[in-house]
């Protein structure tokens, strides 16, 4: 009896559960549409983010390549000017009050070099010359032109203290005798040659520009290739204390020109100084004659 009752209850429960399962509604297409839409939205957002990231990278690459392109590439950089100043350690800092202070290269670089030559006219000498030429009637704006004409005149004639000039130096609507100008140069610069040395680079460029060597080059025994060398101040062409042309030297003197100039200079000086052997030029000493010719022995020179 009890077993049959249990079986009946069990069968009833099974039937009830089957009815419940059979009563549950089936899912429709609408149930899946919302889920698929959210998943598609997430996928499209991820794709869009990836595309934007790729575009940003491409834009960055484009800008990078644009910055690197160009027709100019600086090579062999060796910049020193404008570099950051070094900070020395405390025990290495200079003491300018001590005469045995060791200056550093950095300190030496701050002392600007000034080219000085005692063998040419100074700035004070030239100022005296300019003022005196103005006083003689040369317009201020033409004083340098007159001085350069005088220097070029000496290139052809001579810069000797014994030079007796001829002619005049001109400017627009005016002129002054060469005697007056050279007298001022000799007086205010002590010697005419000191002024000519100051303008030696200018004279050199003028000769090369006009192909105008010293007029007496052939008579002085120079060869055609060395025709620009025979002027008194040739050895000051490369002197940095002299007045420099605006663009610099057209070319430097050649070694051959230097040899030719120095050879002629040696001969000329020995000829001019033959009386220097006398301690006095009185007739009792000289006998009324010039001194002996000064000779130089070139036998020991290397001429092989």
Swiss-Prot record:
Function: Required for genome encapsidation. Forms ribonucleoprotein complexes along with TGB1 helicase and viral RNA.
MF terms (GO), sorted A to Z: structural molecule activity
InterPro entries: Carlavirus_coat_N, Pltvir_coat
Compositionally skewed regions (Basic and acidic residues) per UniProt: 1-24, 32-54
Family the entry assigns: Belongs to the potexviruses coat protein family.
Subcellular location per the Swiss-Prot or TrEMBL entry: Virion
Miscellaneous comment as given in the Swiss-Prot or TrEMBL entry: The N- and the C-terminus of this capsid protein may be exposed on the surface of the virus particle. The central core sequence may be important in maintaining correct tertiary structure of the capsid protein and/or play a role in interacting with the viral RNA.
Keywords: Capsid protein, Helical capsid protein, Ribonucleoprotein, Virion
Database matches in Pfam families: Flexi_CP, Flexi_CP_N
Region annotated Disordered, chain positions: 1-54
Protein name: Capsid protein
Annotated Gene Ontology cellular component terms: helical viral capsid; ribonucleoprotein complex
